[in-house]
Amino acid sequence: MIVLPNKVRIFINDRMKKDIYLGISNFGFENDIDEILGIAHLLEHLLISFDSTNFLANASTSRSYMSFWCKSINSATESDAIRTLVSWFFSNGKLKDNFSLSSIRFHIKELENEYYFRNEVFHCMDILTFLSGGDLYNGGRIDMIDNLNIVRDMLVNRMQRISGSNIVIFVKRLGPGTLDFFKQTFGSLPACPEIIPSSIPVSTNGKIVMTPSPFYTVMVKINPTLDNILGILYLYETYHLIDYETIGNQLYLTVSFIDETEYESFLRGEAILQISQCQSINMNYSDDYMMNIYLNFPWLSHDLYDYITRINDDSKSILISLTNEIYASIINRDIIVIYPNFSKAMCNTRDTQQHPIVVLDATNDGLIKKPYRSIPLMKRLTSNEIFIRYGDASLMDMITLSLSKQDISLKRNAEGIRVKHSFSADDIQAIMESDSFLKYSRSKPAAMYQYIFLSFFASGNSIDDILANRDSTLEFSKRTKSKILFGRNTRYDVTAKSSFVCGIVRGKSLDKTSLVEMMWDLKKKGLIYSMEFTNLLSKNTFYLFTFTIYTDEVYDYLNTNKLFSAKCLVVSTKGDVENFSSLKKDVVIRV
């Protein structure tokens, strides 16, 4: 670890795929409480800008921090990627503090699309922020557009809070020129922020929250000490369904269960977690997980690898102390309990955006202060991989699981998805067969539309057959050579329970790079949040899908795009009753 005079921390990580990865601690949307919710997320969208033909890049805003990364591709170099990312924050050697109203307006529209996307596919319910005075969704809404001048002032104010002590930088390689460049830019920031934000309200403990969830989860408040952080690292590397959450200076260990009986035993204090010592902890974490640790605990004064001897040699005492603290929090009700609930009728409170939720007090009734049993945890395997065809009945369940677990990766091709994970076969089956997970998986049917129409365009099946078997989406045609013939009509209007545009496009020079560039152009115009595309077996032919509230504008953009020599697009209007009758005539596509 290299520490600049203003406390910027720089790490060399030659194993990461990114060229540069930058995080800003104490800079997430928890800072929006008592301001306009969404300022942090809007700032993220305003800052990131790059040439998608030369770079891959992304950014994210979490509760307590913001992070950005960039990777060079094609003819660009690592140095180009570093300079591109730094340019998001600095202009002519000075920290950016000016944002045009037109750009702010476009990105607010994009935020509204992201809200729509996330609520169609996920259950975006941030319990901790809600209990601390925020909302269940804190990513920004379209009504921000009514206060553009105030929003712009808040964005400038937020930029002035950035200080050297907030900055963490990972680089793949660090030469003298790069280090000097960092000193001239991020190294020029003040060691402490020019504007000190107000303290974040303390969240309320001793609450039971009934909300959609794939698991029965208990958030246990523990002290944010070094030993407890090492204990969390130990548990995370060894077991599934254990993680942590932070808000302000508070730390919660999250423990999830698939068995309701075990969950209730843990809550009543009659059972403790069965934590076994493993042979060794390697700290072989992803760069995302490492960055999160440094940002959530900015007071860590050493490289995490400096603690590898301590976490292994002192694991017994660390885990005993952590186990005792967990149990004390259970007894004292320093917990937030999440109980899976999928009823739309049950509600006893709402956030300012009128999202309904049930919040109850966690009482001491039935507490047993002498545990007499232990609960086994799901152990991690080194690595596992499976391939699921689009016709497999478990397809949507696996997609749902990957969306609820950050350490599961999906890679899609024309025939199915390849899934990398670290579960045993028995554990993954137990999760997918659990009652709460099955209800969660079925509670957001919008994600299914992407695969319904992918199956329609890539197979010879009719829309009626596909809809009749939507739980398995039907297996694709196994013919390796299929010729897609486009009809005269380029637009088919349907009614579904989600608003989206999808279809197949073909072009002589069409490739993934051009489609990514197209996606970013649509994002800059505020018309979409993201666009998925799948390369079909026919040459230069892709399937596109995007959730959007601006369906006509997106259709017009795609319909007039000169890269497409042929196209067939479906435009869905949101409604209570599905109507796909326009696709029943044999005029759309023949395989």
From Swiss-Prot:
Q: What is its EC number?
A: 3.4.24.-
Family annotation (Pfam families): Peptidase_M44
InterPro entries recorded? Metalloenz_LuxS/M16, Peptidase_M44
Q: Which GO terms describe its molecular function?
A: metalloendopeptidase activity; zinc ion binding
Ligand binding (Zn(2+)): H41, H45, E112
Query: Which EC main class describes this enzyme?
Result: hydrolase
The prosthetic group or cofactor this protein requires is: Zn(2+)
Q: Which gene encodes it?
A: OPG085
Q: Which GO terms describe its cellular component?
A: virion component
Cofactor note text? Binds 1 zinc ion.
* Active site positions: E44
Q: What are the UniProt keywords, alphabetically?
A: Hydrolase, Late protein, Metal-binding, Metalloprotease, Protease, Virion, Zinc
| Superkingdom per UniProt | Viruses
Cell compartments where the protein resides: Virion
Instruction: Give the similarity note.
Output: Belongs to the peptidase M44 family.
Specify the protein name: Metalloendopeptidase OPG085
Q: What does the PTM comment state?
A: Undergoes proteolytic processing during the course of infection. May be cleaved into 46 kDa and 22 kDa products (Potential).
List this protein's GO terms for biological process: proteolysis; viral life cycle
**Purpose:** Probably involved in maturation of some viral proteins by processing them preferentially at Ala-Gly-|-Ser/Thr/Lys motifs. Does not seem to be responsible for the cleavage of major core proteins.
